[in-house]
Amino acid sequence: IAKSWPSEFCLEANSLAIQIHGGYGYTRDFPVEQYWRDNRLNMIHEGTHGIQAADLLGRKVLMENGRGMQLLSARMQATMAQAVAVPELAAYAAQLGDALQQVGAATQAAWATGNPAEALANAVPYMQAFGHTVLAWVWLDVALATLRADATLSIAASAGRMGAARYFYHYELPKIGAWLNVVNSRDTTCAALSEAAF
């Protein structure tokens, strides 16, 4: 997740930055076009997204009977426990808890038949959902730190951080449901196509 998820979604952020500037975004008057080109290389440097996703679902979350996932879950739950006590963040803590549960259930559903071809057929949407869940945790932690430092959000940067956290929880985290649907059902729409069909 730390390698491949950012290489995919940071490029999307760069693309949106170009779009926000309109025609000017594609000129050298602003650095966003250079950022896009530089960030596009990350997807190449970090290896194939699908390979990283298959390694995550096929090996990393299963290692030592899921110990790594349990440790990550415990850290996320500790952050959620702090956030539940903050009225502005309690709903986000609950939403993150639900997302974490969905990822755990999808991990089990993917491997329900024990067939690696079925389990890994949707490794990419699994990693997208898992990555979004991890980022939701990071945003919850950022929101906690922001409110501790500036409870009234009197500093513009504090208001910006809280706005970004709200955005992620309202617009990005809900996407995991669609991604995990195909993981849960072990959908083979893409994997079942023969090479000749392409």
Where are the predicted features?
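Alpha-helix capping/hinge segments and adjacent helical runs
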Residues: 1-71, 167-189
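Predominant activation on well-ordered alpha-helical scaffold segments within soluble catalytic domains
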Residues: 7, 11-15, 54-58, 70-73, ...
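C-terminal amphipathic alpha-helical interaction region
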Residues: 63, 78-198
